[in-house]
Every structure is written in structure tokens, then in C-alpha cells.
Amino acid sequence: MSHLIFNQPSEDKSALEDAGDFTPRFDDRGLITAIVTDAGDGELLMVAHMNAQALALTIQTGTAHYFSRSRGKIWKKGETSGNLQTVKEIRTDCDQDAIWLKVEVAGHDATCHTGRRSCFYRTVTLREGKPMLDIIDDERHFDPQDIYGK
């Protein structure tokens, strides 16, 4: 499979906003933010990052690939757990420095490595002047120990 090459973004704001060319604006580390939601019900599943190669693989294969900042490499989401993300639609924002993936999740229908459907399973609340986390989704679709051995 040939590697897609993205053209450099235009300095002209109107070209970024209105032209038909997809010219993603990667940050100084070569990454673009990816917001991921469920294609069916719109639930926010995760936020990740992509480099040019991960974005190209995602576009070419229809399966979500991301760049792991901690591991310093590309990973196909769900390759280990079986919870692959099939991309149904890709959108970009007005200045092309973020993308939005609408996906269908295979396997256990879980996106988070904790076994939950979404990585956003906690709310931030203020109790006695201290920010605290409250779990709002404790349902685990799989046991991470069984999948990752952690």
C-alpha cells in the first residue's frame, strides 16, 4: 500500500476553511489531535493523536490507527483486544488542526484499555474545595488482565 502524502497547509486562512484540499496541520511534534465518537449513538469514546503515517493508514484502510506518544510508535486500535475501530466518517475542523473520527467498535464494544466503552467514564466534581473524580460508568466489557496481562 502506497503511503499518502499530505500537502503543506496553506498560510491563507480562507484556503484552509473553504478549499477542497485536505491539508492537515500537524503540531511541532508532527501530531494531530483525533476525537473519536461512536458512529451510531455519538458517544465520545476517546481522544488520541495521529502522525501523518497513522492518519494515512486510517484513511487508506478504514481502520483507526493512532500514534502512541508514550511508546513512540503507531498502533492499530483494538489489535490486541479485538476491539478494532472501523471508521465510518472522518471530519476536520475549520483550520484542519484536529480531526473527528466516527467509528464502529468491534469485539467487546469497548474503547478504553480499562475495559470500559469510553475513556471518559469519570466526571470531575468539587467536594469540600477539592477537585475529585466520580465514576459514572463502571461497566467493564472485558477484563484488562485477561487481554493485556497487566
Curated annotation (Swiss-Prot):
Transmembrane segments: none annotated. It catalyses: 1-(5-phospho-beta-D-ribosyl)-5'-AMP + H2O = 1-(5-phospho-beta-D-ribosyl)-5-[(5-phospho-beta-D-ribosylamino)methylideneamino]imidazole-4-carboxamide. The keyword Repeat does not apply. SUPFAM superfamilies: HisI-like. It is found in: Cytoplasm. One of its GO terms (molecular function) is phosphoribosyl-AMP cyclohydrolase activity. The keyword Chloroplast does not apply. Its EC number is 3.5.4.19. HAMAP family: HisI. NCBIfam families: PRK00051.1. Belongs to the PRA-CH family. This is Phosphoribosyl-AMP cyclohydrolase. The gene is hisI.
